[in-house]
Structure formats: structure tokens, C-alpha cells
Design a protein with these regions (language model features):
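Membrane-embedded transmembrane alpha-helical bundles that form the catalytic cores
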Residues: 1-379, 383-386
Length: 386
């Protein structure tokens, strides 16, 4: 807006901000995505390009031979985290959300704060830098809380994550044909739990260690698998990344008002497009491979589908569910059914789907869903002591 702190900034400040962000993104792309982008270009154009480490070339005295290898790019540890924090600092200072640090040592301390450097949480400048100039404080209660965070993280990592990986997940994934379908499915669910326990365990330990040093890091996970929809999941999973993407990517893209600077009358469409772009880039941030790109795209699509689904009429939802279930059942039958039975299968599927749809409609008219919801609320209130 015209009253925002950055609206009156001189053009030089905007140029320095843009230059800083471009350098940060350039370094991230160079070290983390060089192989990925090179492979994409080679696959699309049929070329034979190879990565070339310009920093090793300079370190060798502008020579391809020497102490450093020019044909390999070594990924610095934690680069995804601390470059995001560097961008957070420059953007927050530009926006007037935080005062600049007093010296280069304070800036280096913020960027390289070791507890969260490798696995997060991602700390924004306006959350951490003011703590640099506060007196150290560690009461008995805070000490106990810090120890709890550390022990909680160790239990998640050692007792849960590592145990599942060694005794179940690795065995099934290495030889899936030796196990039943149920065991393979169970291993997939266990892998989801392992990823959560591993990641959140590390961040819990980081929060506890930082607290012992007098610093407070934001909570990074809030029981994400209790979420009821994709939107809620991303408010509970890797919360520091979600907040970063919202503040420095989704809102600058236009939020629900515009897309890439172009105003849109349909705010829902604008929000959906920007959400998808944000999740797509968020997926790529997690790793330099198509798996993460697809994963980000699926999360973005899931959020859009949920938003559309949440606004639908109940009858339309039931109709779509009927068509979906009938289609899945039909597809399953067609895999083992001769072609001449195809029309019979479709007839059965449509009949069953229509029957289920009207059963749901009848139950709704009788008010059973409302009664069940009321009973559920009373039971929850009784359990919680309300």
C-alpha cells in the first residue's frame, strides 16, 4: 500500500534488495540445482552439457587442474536454510520489520546459528535478531522446558524413527516382493511416521539447545497428521517454512488479488494460482529432483481441490463421490473382466452408485448426521471435562 514503509524507499534501496535476493537465489540454484537443471536441459535438447564448478576453477588459479575438482559441485551443508534466512534479513530490513544488525558478527551469528542450521526451523530475521540484544535469561523452569524439548526430540529420532527404519521400512523397501500387500502398505504408512519423527525430532532438539543458550526458536510441527485437510496440514507441518513461503513468496506474488503483478477480478482463482506456484516451488526447495517437484504440485493441487470442495453443496459432493467410487470399482473390475462384460460392469457400477447416493440423501433427510454430530460434540465435551 501507499502507506507501507517500503513505498517511500529510494530506488537505490530497491536495487540493492533485488541484487541481494538475486545473488542468494543464484547461489542456491548453482550449488543445489546445477545437476538437476543440467540434466533437464540435456534430456530436452539431447545435449551433453556437464556441470562446471567456477569457484574451484578460480581456486585453482583459473586452471582446470589443481587442488579442487572443477567437474563436481559440492553442496554446502544447510545452504537451503541459511540462504532463506539471509533473504529474510534483507527483506525484513527493507520492509522496516527489523532494525539492521550492529555489526557483521551479529549478522554471521544469526545466519550460522548452529542448532537449527541443518534441519531448521527456519528463523526469520524479525524473530531472531531482537533476541541478540536482550540479556541472557535461563530460569529453572526454562531449563526444564529446554531439557524436555531435547529429550522429546531424542525419543522421536532414536526410539521411533530409527526403530521403524531399521526393523520395518528398510527391510520392506529393499525387497517388497518378499512381503504381502498389507505389509507393503503398512511400511508406506510407517515411512510417513518415520519422516515426521525424524524431522520433528531434529527440530525439537534444536529448539531445546537454543533455549539453553537463551534463544527461542519457533515451533516447527503441531501434530500435522491430525489435520483434516491439506490446508490445515501445511499450517501444522514444517510451520517455519510455511510462514516463510507465505510472507516472502505467496503474498509478493499477489496473494488472492493478483498473479505475477497482474490484478485479477476473481480472488479465488488468483489465490489458487499463487498457492499452486508457492507449493510447487516449496516442493523444489526440499530437493533437486522431479519427485519433489511432483510432490509440491500434488500438494498445491490438493489445496485447490479442497478449497473448491469445501464450497460445494452437500448433494453435489455426494454425486461426485458416487461417480468416483463407481468409477474406481468399475476400473478394478475391468482389469480382470473380459471386454464383452464391460457394459454389464458399468451397469452394476451405476446402479450401486445411484443406490448409495440416495441412501446418503435419505439419511440426511432423516437428520441422522445432525444427531450424530451433536452426540459427538457432547462426548468430546464430556471427555475434556467441559
Amino acid at each position: 500500500s501507499s502507506n507501507s514503509p517500503q513505498s517511500g524507499r529510494p530506488i537505490a534501496a530497491k536495487i540493492w534488495l533485488a541484487l541481494s535476493v538475486l545473488i542468494d537465489l543464484g547461489l542456491l540454484c548453482y550449488f543445489k540445482y546445477a545437476y538437476f537443471f543440467t540434466n533437464v536441459v540435456n534430456d530436452l535438447l539431447g545435449t551433453q552439457f556437464a556441470v562446471f564448478d567456477i569457484f574451484s576453477y578460480i581456486g585453482n588459479g583459473f586452471s582446470e587442474s589443481g587442488r579442487f575438482m572443477v567437474d563436481k559441485i559440492i553442496l554446502p551443508v544447510g545452504i537451503s536454510f541459511y540462504l532463506f534466512q539471509v533473504m529474510s534479513y534483507t527483506i525484513d530490513v527493507y520492509r522496516g520489520h527489523v532494525q539492521p544488525v550492529k555489526n557483521i558478527l551479529d549478522f554471521g551469528f544469526y545466519v550460522s546459528f548452529f542448532p537449527q542450521l541443518v534441519a531448521g526451523p527456519i528463523v526469520r530475521a524479525n524473530e531472531f535478531i531482537p533476541q541478540l540484544y536482550r540479556p541472557f535469561r535461563l530460569s529453572r523452569r526454562l531449563f526444564g522446558l529446554a531439557v524436555f524439548w531435547i529429550l522429546n526430540g531424542l525419543v522421536k529420532k532414536i526410539v521411533l524413527s530409527d526403530y521403524l527404519a531399521v526393523n520395518l521400512i528398510d527391510r520392506v523397501f529393499e525387497n517388497p516382493l518378499l512381503f504381502s500387500g498389507f505389509e507393503n502398505l503398512f511400511a508406506l504408512f510407517a515411512y510417513s511416521l518415520q519422516v515426521y519423527a525424524d524431522f520433528s525430532g531434529y527440530t525439537d532438539i534444536a529448539i531445546g539447545i537454543a533455549m539453553l543458550m537463551g534463544f527461542y526458536l519457533p515451533q516447527n510441527f503441531d501434530s500435522p497428521y491430525k489435520s483434516r485437510n491439506p490446508q490445515e496440514f501445511w499450517r501444522r507441518w514444517h510451520m517455519s517454512l510455511s510462514r516463510w513461503l507465505k510472507s516472502y513468496l505467496y503474498i509478493p506474488l499477489g496473494g488472492n488479488r493478483s498473479v505475477l503483478g497482474k490484478p485479477m477480478k476473481n480472488k479465488i482463482a488468483a489465490g489458487n494460482v499463487n498457492s499452486f506456484i508457492t507449493m510447487l516451488l516449496g516442493g523444489l526447495w526440499h530437493g533437486a529432483s522431479w519427485n519433489f517437484v511432483i510432490w509440491g504440485a500434488l500438494n498445491g493441487a490438493g489445496m485447490i481441490v479442497y478449497k473448491v470442495w469445501a464450497k460445494m453443496n452437500w448433494n453435489i459432493k455426494m454425486l461426485l463421490m458416487t461417480i468416483l467410487m463407481g468409477g474406481l470399482w468399475t476400473a478394478h473390475q475391468l482389469l480382470a473382466t473380459p471386454i464383452w462384460n464391460m457394459f454389464f460392469v458399468w451397469g452394476i457400477a451405476l446402479w450401486v452408485g445411484t443406490f448409495i447416493r440416495y441412501v446418503y440423501w435419505w439419511i440426511e433427510r432423516m437428520g441422522y448426521f445432525a444427531i450424530a454430530g451433536t452426540l459427538r460434540a457432547k462426548v468430546i465435551g464430556w471427555i475434556s471435562g467441559g
